Amino acid sequence: MTSGEEIRKFWADTRAALDQVDPQLTMEAVESSDPFAREGNIKSRTTYRTIMSSFEGVRIRAWYTVPSGKPPARGWPAILEVPGYGGILPLPIHLVQYGYAVLTLYPRGQGESLHEWQIEHGTRVVYNVTDRDRYYYRGAYMDCVRGVDFLSGRPEVDAGRIGVWGFSQGGGLSLATAALDRRIVAAVAGVPWLCNFPVAAESTTSPYSELHDYLTQHPERRAQAMASLAYFDQLNLAEQIACPVLVGGALIDEVHPLKTIMPVFERIRSLKSIVIYPDTDHEYRTDFTYHAKAWMDRYLR
């Protein structure tokens, strides 16, 4: 069984390796990607195509959207927004219009970052799953931390007011980022993934079914795969979270079942709250967006 100390050392070493990578940042204002950037004749925000180097030198892409006009004296509060499985994310108009700078980040091999790097074989959740050092989510988690590096270094951003927000896979990435980076001041995780792998591995509903099928087809690799996944399981990272966390769950969600989420939530030691919907499955509720924005306003304003 992997100890908490082993997990902490693994991530400390991984963070140290990321810190050695020059971001080689490029930014280009791309107004055509945000057709609603003007309200009437008034420009309300600017969106930049942002490309940077992350863990092991892999290039990743993001949209950086910032309100127009002079920032407040201490800078804009900022939110790192991370995607569901596959990298689908809308531009965060609902956040920027309320005065947040937002980095909409696509981890390696997802969404916009497919232009820079692609998985050679298999799927993300089982990519090198038996090798903790080469597993897909080692790089993906560090891509999120690189996003925090970006925001904390922006002159128009208040580095003391950075949050992370995500749904589904993005919920898992939000929890992981909050656990691995103390610069995160608030986190929102809607129906998070990457939780409680020993239970999740029995699910036959996509995308956890990718893991289930792999372990069924390769039973001789199960022990090694589960030992590797322990380093990436929110169940083992949750106790490292120090910021306020809002979690969303759903009783009839078969994609990310509540039985995978609740044990993680229970291990979070910081201030926390959970919203559980009794009558919805794996879907984004509009009212959860209101709860999430109120959470960010409370801790980032």
Walk through the language-model features, giving the residues of each:
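Cap/lid segment of the alpha/beta-hydrolase catalytic domain
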Residues: 90-96, 101-142, 199
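Short beta-strand/loop motif that positions the catalytic acidic residue
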Residues: 241, 247-249
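Gly/Ser-rich "nucleophile elbow"/oxyanion-hole loop immediately N-terminal to the catalytic nucleophile
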Residues: 125-168
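N-terminal cap/lid segment of alpha/beta-hydrolase-fold proteins
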Residues: 21-73
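C-terminal catalytic histidine-bearing segment of alpha/beta-hydrolase fold enzymes
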Residues: 3, 262-301
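Conserved alpha/beta-hydrolase "acid-adjacent" motif
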Residues: 254-260
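Short glycine-enriched nucleophile-adjacent loop
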Residues: 151-152, 164-165, 171-182, 187, ...
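Hydrolase active-site cap/lid region
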Residues: 175-221, 276, 284
